[in-house]
Amino acid sequence: MERAKVDFLRAASHELKTPVTALNATLENMILGVGKYQNYATYLPECKEMVEQLSGMIHEILETSKLNLTAEAPKQVDVSELLAELCEPYQLIAAAHQIMFSLDLPEQFPATLPAGPFSKAVSNVLANAVAYTEAGKVVSVYMEGRSLVVENECQPIPDDEIRRLFEPFYRPDFSRSRESGGNGLGLYIVNTLLTSMNIPYSFAPMKSPPGMCFTIQL
């Protein structure tokens, strides 16, 4: 556990270094009046945007660093009801990007689990699925036996890349850039939470239709 914390903090420090360096260089050039940086009207808004990105990153890092600090007691929940609530915002996001979102749940699905951490883990799985699905493709959420399945149609990810996706701040070549919202923490958070709850999961490519399938065993 301590090694994992050290690795996370090392990765976080490295991740923050680049935007801090860029912001410092931009401000320094503005102060010195170097070339194009004399145009404050252009570069002050850019600096503000960098600060907002840094603020968001720091918030995510702090929230992620606290994942293992508290333990929520398991309780009886209706997973179907919980999933319907969790999926609602992602259905709206999907619709806005012309992505079809299929939700097929039983009327009730009782389970005993920590609702807060489980909800956060599933939300990150859903966010990841919608983020990497192109317009005209489908995200499907359904129960299969005692398993929650989240599928999204996309270019399947190679096995050697899948393992690294659960490392903090890892972004493969096909991943979105930081500017478009990806921070490389989503699946790291999923792994941390599900592992802490002793909930098995798998993340594997699909052949037909091509895509990825995230399965959580309840």
Language model feature labels by segment:
Residues 45-54:
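Short alpha-helical segment of the dimerization/phosphotransfer core of two-component systems
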Residues 68-75, 110-115:
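Conserved micro-motifs of the catalytic ATP-binding
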Residues 95, 100-110:
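Conserved catalytic submotifs in the C-terminal HATPase_c
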Residues 129-130:
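Short helix-loop "hinge" at the ATP-lid/N-box region of the Bergerat-fold HATPase_c
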Residues 136-147:
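Short beta-strand/loop element within the Bergerat-fold HATPase_c
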Residues 157-171:
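Short conserved segment of the HATPase_c
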Residues 198-206:
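Glycine-rich ATP-binding loops of the HATPase_c
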